């Protein structure tokens, strides 16, 4: 099964959720919190990775749901 990693990325004054390798956004939100909640549910359902970017576009946090629903967090600096 193909992994459906989810990225939460800045978009203008808001945030977007985008599946890795796809062109279209899954969600556009005013808040990062809502975007993260949406992306986390998709990542859990598909046993994928949630990658959260900061306002500068750099990866801030990676949550790995590949082996179940308990994420393995990796913070980027």
Descriptions of predicted regions:
Residues 2-24:
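Short aromatic-glycine-(Arg/Gly/Cys) micro-motifs in beta-strand/loop hairpins
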Residues 22-33:
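A short, exposed loop/beta-hairpin motif centered on an aromatic-Gly-Thr core
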Residues 59-77:
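A cross-kingdom feature marking charged/low-complexity
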């Amino acid at each position: 099964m193909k992994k459906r990693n989810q990225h939460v990325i800045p978009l203008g004054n808001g945030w977007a959720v985008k599946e890795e390798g796809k062109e279209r956004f899954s969600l556009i939100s005013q808040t990062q919190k809502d975007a993260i909640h949406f992306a986390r549910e998709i990542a859990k359902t598909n046993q994928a990775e949630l990658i959260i970017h900061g306002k500068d576009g750099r990866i801030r946090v990676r949550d790995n749901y590949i082996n179940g629903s308990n994420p393995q967090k990796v913070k980027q600096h």
